[in-house]
Amino acid sequence: MASFFSFLLGEKKKTANVAKERLQIILAHERSGRNSHEPDYLPALQRDLIAVIAKYININPNDIKLNLERQENLDVLEVKIELPDK
């Protein structure tokens, strides 16, 4: 209830609380960026794609390449599949 009145009355946050919030934001940003080059799900996604494509086409698993690139605020997943000759 006190925080509600603080909000209404415009009580300023203490410097320690502001610093703590900023640190939490920085840590969250660093943690999310740590594995941004290759997320944990990428190898599993590649295995699943190989399994699905293998149902329809006889393909070498090495002929499927996944690449994740970051372009500004956009993640782009590129999938290259080298299909066998008929």
UniProtKB/Swiss-Prot annotation:
HAMAP family: MinE. It comes from the Bacteria. The gene is minE. One of its GO terms (biological process) is regulation of division septum assembly. SUPFAM superfamilies: Cell division protein MinE topological specificity domain. It comes from Polaromonas naphthalenivorans (strain CJ2). Keywords: Cell cycle, Cell division. Belongs to the MinE family. Prevents the cell division inhibition by proteins MinC and MinD at internal division sites while permitting inhibition at polar sites. This ensures cell division at the proper site by restricting the formation of a division septum at the midpoint of the long axis of the cell. This is Cell division topological specificity factor. The lineage of its organism: Bacteria, Pseudomonadati, Pseudomonadota, Betaproteobacteria, Burkholderiales.
